[in-house]
Amino acid sequence: MTQMLTRPDVDLVNGMFYADGGAREAYRWMRANEPVFRDRNGLAAATTYQAVLDAERNPELFSSTGGIRPDQPGMPYMIDMDDPQHLLRRKLVNAGFTRKRVMDKVDSIGRLCDTLIDAVCERGECDFVRDIAAPLPMAVIGDMLGVLPTERDMLLKWSDDLVCGLSSHVDEAAIQKLMDTFAAYTEFTKDVITKRRAEPTDDLFSVLVNSEVEGQRMSDDEIVFETLLILIGGDETTRHTLSGGTEQLLRHRDQWDALVADVDLLPGAIEEMLRWTSPVKNMCRTLTADTVFHGTELRAGEKIMLMFESANFDESVFGDPDNFRIDRNPNSHVAFGFGTHFCLGNQLARLELRLMTERVLRRLPDLRLADDAPVPLRPANFVSGPESMPVVFTPSAPVLA
């Protein structure tokens, strides 16, 4: 581990910062020397665990309504709302994410995991991202939303395009692609909403169409935005934690072997996978008043990035944070955020991670990286993780008829 001695000259909006392998060294300098850091363009960033929590505990000063991305305005979905509007919308959407609804998916998610492994198990090799990690959450979310299996690839592409649009510099081409994708998604979603109003089913679309809190229901446009948030949030984050976390298990063979021998160690491993990968790199809050925050002057109207990944490697909270340890306890990471905006889908994400990792450990116990080359990361400033991860294993027979 090298120690950065000079102030990092970085652009926190440039996706390459999160993908070139230097971010965590830069974070270390920021936490030690400038807990609320300004990058080369003047963008403020809360980098310590305490600074992130302090901002999240004070939404009156650190508002979500200006939008969670540094260079884009707020959108009409709950992640860009403050309470009480946020709380009302959250209650409406939460009807589709109750513990019972999530646990009712155990068998179907388990079958899906086996189906994905069955598709590659006889080959003895696959791309873990493309073949295992990426299809799982999209299929789960697609199933919950009630979309047809044939429509999942389309949803996956829309999700990728939208996240890339939210995670990159805004230029005319990016804006146009974002608008085209959103228009296609809106047309698709409104058609589904119309069908569910006429013939309700038990899927998430039907729940959102018919859920009511304090006498209020969501409009069609509100359902479009909230399902879009569910699609993006449920896809990318779980995908990157599964692939990036599995990479670390494979690079720490003693810990992989311990899990193969004792699956009861898995809950701790899942939490360390979440901390280590920190797939949501940051979110922004907008200052409602001038203040001095952890030694840095902030102005009303400016945005500050809450650096969740940096917080998850804060030495004052996590002992030996740069070592991956499945026995880490306590592990109070903020991979799902903190406070009123704590991730609504955290139970579903943990379930998917557990069910797939259980099966990979059992069915592909000698899984290993195809080579020692670094796993390439997606150059994105919002949600980032492995782009590709070739793996090899001893071929085996499918388990589903």
UniProtKB/Swiss-Prot annotation:
Q: Which cofactors does the annotated protein need, by name?
A: heme
Q: Which reaction does it catalyse?
A: cholest-4-en-3-one + 6 reduced [2Fe-2S]-[ferredoxin] + 3 O2 + 5 H(+) = (25R)-3-oxocholest-4-en-26-oate + 6 oxidized [2Fe-2S]-[ferredoxin] + 4 H2O
Q: Which UniProt keywords apply?
A: Cholesterol metabolism, Heme, Iron, Lipid degradation, Lipid metabolism, Metal-binding, Monooxygenase, NADP, Oxidoreductase, Steroid metabolism, Sterol metabolism
The record's SUPFAM superfamilies line, in alphabetical order, gives: Cytochrome P450
Q: Where does heme bind?
A: C343
Annotated Gene Ontology MF terms? cholest-4-en-3-one 26-monooxygenase activity; heme binding; iron ion binding; steroid hydroxylase activity
Q: What class of enzyme is it?
A: oxidoreductase
Q: What induces it?
A: By cholesterol.
Q: In which pathway does it act?
A: Steroid metabolism; cholesterol degradation
Write down the superkingdom of origin.
Bacteria
Q: Which CDD domains match?
A: CYP142-like (cd11033)
Under Enzyme Commission nomenclature, its number is: 1.14.15.28
- Record carries keyword RNA-binding: no
Consequence of gene disruption: Cells lacking this gene show a slight reduction in the levels of cholest-4-en-3-one-26-oate, but the concentration of 26-hydroxycholest-4-en-3-one is not measurably affected. The levels of 26-hydroxycholest-4-en-3-one and cholest-4-on-3-one-26-oate are drastically reduced in cells lacking both cyp125A3 and cyp142A2.
Say what the protein does: Involved in the utilization of cholesterol as the sole carbon and energy source by degrading the side chain. Primarily catalyzes the sequential oxidation of the terminal methyl of cholest-4-en-3-one into (25R)-26-hydroxycholest-4-en-3-one (alcohol), (25R)-26-oxocholest-4-en-3-one (aldehyde), to finally yield the carboxylic acid (25R)-3-oxocholest-4-en-26-oate. Also able to sequentially oxidize cholesterol itself, not only cholest-4-en-3-one.
Spell out the family assignment given in the record's similarity comment: Belongs to the cytochrome P450 family.
Protein name (record):
Steroid C26-monooxygenase
Organism the protein comes from = Mycolicibacterium smegmatis (strain ATCC 700084 / mc(2)155) (Mycobacterium smegmatis)
